[in-house]
Regions:
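N-terminal segments that cap or nucleate solenoid repeat domains
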Residues: 57-64, 69-73, 77-151, 205-224, ...
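Beta-rich interaction/scaffold domains
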Residues: 1-59, 72-74
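Solenoid scaffold repeats with emphasis on beta-solenoid/beta-helix
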Residues: 86-87, 108-109, 118-120, 140, ...
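Short linear proline/tyrosine/threonine-rich motifs used for host-factor recruitment
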Residues: 28, 36-38, 99, 109, ...
Length: 390
């Protein structure tokens, strides 16, 4: 450049100044993971549409020892006892069935997932929630392994608590990865929508404008159901999502169940009540920034731990006892702050003597802080739009 004559340098600068800069579109990364939201949404749509539009097992999904093949080779007997899983095994290349015994000495059948992303889709129920005590189905363990796995049922998941089946069976372990569990896809009052960052959530059908609707196949449109009951679910590490969509008429969505979300920034969305059985239902957020969303139902603090945010939808209610917020190990509230958002028909019941403190502004939300001597170092911040605080 220094060798260019001075007279030409001026002309060169004029030409550079006249250039029109290239227009580069803004790239948004709402969750800060280094990937553009548009790319995440496109990948998520392909992933979810595959599961939403294909029901691999149209009836119930279960295993039952085949008594007609008692003297057949072990492989034949196993195949007949797990015949309901045939299509799912075909669709998840590399997945296999095996068997062992549970703690009670009963035969238990095991789904061993593929090395990739498993897709298990069921038109009706997984397990035996629709059965009475006289109907025999074997215990099961579902291990999807690592990968971004998804399980969807049109109806229920687990065992029928109302028939006295209080012992936990049908253990589910989804392994490492960003996994998804949807129970109650047949709830015709709701749409599942895809947000810009690739995450999903459920909304009432008149609110579907807040995201892109991903429709369920009509094979999920089965009879009454939508409850998680009598089972243990471990979502594993990763940013996991659980949608417990409940019954169309409302009522209990989770009863007598343990749901462990694992390390990661997880979300569980519940339509209906959370109740205990012979022991409280337990939903743990574990390490990470975790969110519990409840609509048209209530949850008590004895049923959850390790959550940093609670979103109360329409007619959503949470009752908090201070000592329940003091977690152990991975179930502490990260940062010692629990934020609760909602609206005028949401309700927060603070049990005991809470001290009302300062207000905090975060975006368009104004919070009021509450503390209790039984939960030292923990602040509960409640959205001022929630007017029912008792």
């Amino acid at each position: 450049v220094n060798k260019v004559p001075d007279a030409d340098k001026g002309n060169l600068q004029d030409r550079v100044d006249a250039l029109t800069p290239a227009q580069v579109p803004d790239v948004t990364d709402a969750n800060g993971n280094g990937k553009a939201d548009t790319a995440e949404q496109a990948e998520a749509r392909v992933f979810y549409e595959k599961a939403f539009s294909n029901v691999y097992q149209t009836g119930d999904l279960y295993a039952k020892t085949d008594t007609t093949s008692m003297f057949a080779p072990a492989a034949t007997k196993l195949a007949k006892s797990t015949a309901q899983w045939t299509t799912i095994l075909e669709k998840n290349a590399g997945a296999q069935m095996s068997q062992d015994q549970n703690a009670g000495g009963e035969t238990r059948y095991i789904y061993n997932g593929s090395s990739g992303s498993d897709v298990i889709t069921v038109g009706e129920s997984f397990g035996g929630t629709g059965l009475n005590m006289a109907a025999a189905r074997n215990d099961m363990k579902v291990m999807t392994g690592d990968g971004d796995d998804i399980i969807i049922t049109g109806r229920d998941y687990g065992r029928l608590a109302s028939s006295g089946q209080w012992d936990y069976k049908y253990l589910t372990e989804m392994g490492d990865g960003n996994d998804t569990l949807i129970v109650g896809a047949s709830n015709s009052n709701l749409n599942v929508i895809l947000f810009n960052d690739g995450s999903i959530g459920a909304v009432n059908k008149d609110n579907s404008q807040f995201g892109d609707v991903i429709p369920f196949d009509s094979a999920y449109d089965t009879s009454y159901g939508g409850q998680i009951s009598g089972t243990t679910i471990d979502m594993g590490s990763g940013n996991d999502t659980v949608l417990a969509l409940g019954y169309e008429s409302g009522g209990t969505a989770i009863i007598n169940a343990t749901i462990k979300l694992g390390a990661g920034n997880d979300t569980i969305q519940i339509y209906g009540d959370v109740k205990g059985g012979s022991s409280p239902s337990v939903i743990t957020g574990d390490a990470g920034m975790d969110t519990l969303i409840i609509t048209n139902g209530s949850v008590f603090s004895e049923h959850f731990s390790g959550f940093e945010k609670i979103e109360l939808g329409s007619k959503g209610e949470v009752k908090i006892v201070a000592k329940d917020l003091v977690g152990n190990d991975s179930n502490v509230i990260e940062g010692g702050v629990l934020k609760i958002t909602g609206n005028s028909d949401s309700k927060v019941d603070l049990d005991g003597e809470w001290i009302k403190g300062e207000t905090w502004n975060e975006g368009d939300i104004t919070y009021t802080s509450y503390t209790h001597e039984s939960a030292p170092g923990i602040s509960v911040l409640i959205d001022d739009k929630i007017t029912q605080i008792i």
